Amino acid sequence: MGCSSSALNKAGDDNRLRSATEESESCFVQPKPRALGRESTLCGKVQKESLPPLDKLKISAVSTANGVQSLPEQPLAKEAADPPGATEETQPLQGLKGSEPPQPGGKDGAPGAEGKEEDVEAVTEAPPLKGSAETEPLGAEAENQPLITAGERDSTGAVEGTEDPQAAGEMTPLGTAERVPLEAAREPGSQEAGGKGEQSQLPETVPKETESPEILEGSQPVETAEPPQLQETVGENEQSQPLETVPKENASLEVSDGSQSVGAEGKKQLQETLGENEQSQLRETILGEHGGPEVSDGSQSVGAEEEKRLQEMLGKDEQPQLRETIPREHGGPEMSDASQSVETAVKADSLHKAPEGPGNMEKIQPERTVESMEHPAGILETGAKVEMARKIHTNEEDQHIEGETGETVETEMESEKVSEGAETKEEETGEAMDLSAATQIGMDGRVKGHSML
């Protein structure tokens, strides 16, 4: 009450403003428990006094923010829509002016209806501070709404319902609303066009990228297909080269074989010619010496048969050598007798058979020698075994004889001792002792045993 009485006693608007600011500061600073209505009245007074210039600023700001000065309908609509708030704001001022004289007298008592109205007004106007503070970040147009709805938001729900479309109408002027949607529509169109252009560019670029890999991939298969072709061609060339070389080798082999065959044939012809010459020489010599043509013919037939046999027995490689050796052996014109030619043929046969003969002889001889070496040893062993068996039989006969006389046990013990002693001696000296000697020792032992007994 002290704050309200000091504010009401002052006169003039300036004094009221100063006192209201001071009292508001004192109200905020002093944390004294007071009624909410009284404190709100002071704050409400301060806000009431400050709201009218804000309304003027609101109108000017809205007009400048919209940018449309040729539309007088909007402020008229605002004024037409503002009367509820304006009446609410002007009524408290009138109430304050009318209630200023009687308040000093009525403050001591209970507060009147005007105090209640002030409380209601303060309650209705105090929250808009928060609302305005909350809606300030929305921009210049958003700041205009809390100024309009500052005193009207909490008063009635119907007023809020009417103010929202007005605020929407004030916030979005017709010119700007038409321009902005058009521009917005144009911008999405441009964006869509840009998107289409980008999409068209992207398909163009994508096909290029996709085509270029395809082309590259296509070129790569071509390139990769070419190396296999090259490889195939190289392989064909290589195959052709081996084929060519193989025929060459085969041809050379065939040529070599042919040359060998030709050489063999030539050698055969030479041999035949040599044979004919030799045979003619032999015939001449035989005719000159013996004068019997039959013998010469027989020797020739025998020599021809032996040569055929030699050729059949010999291999291709051995034929030229033997043919060379045979003409050398037969080439001497000194060989006159058919017997000599037969002997040379027999020698040649022995030469051809010699590679097999000596090996067989060697194989046969070692076997015989081994057998001859083994058989004497076996004979000696068998002889020794027979002698041992005979001696054992004699020992058994002696034991049987002794068994009849009742002295078998001692002889058996002595024979075991003798055998063990012989074994120990063999182990020590490493020389095998004859069983005959052991038996003799056993006999001596038995004799000694008999003597001891």
Curated annotation (Swiss-Prot):
Modified residues (Phosphoserine): S155
Segments of skewed composition (Polar residues): 230-243, 271-283
Residue spans of biased composition, Acidic residues class: 404-413
Region (Disordered) residue spans: 1-38, 66-377, 394-453
Protein keywords: Phosphoprotein
Keyword Hydrolase part of the UniProt annotation: no
Domain of life the protein comes from: Eukaryota
Residue ranges, compositional bias (Basic and acidic residues): 11-21, 305-332, 364-374, 394-403, 414-424
Protein name (database record): Glutamate-rich protein 5
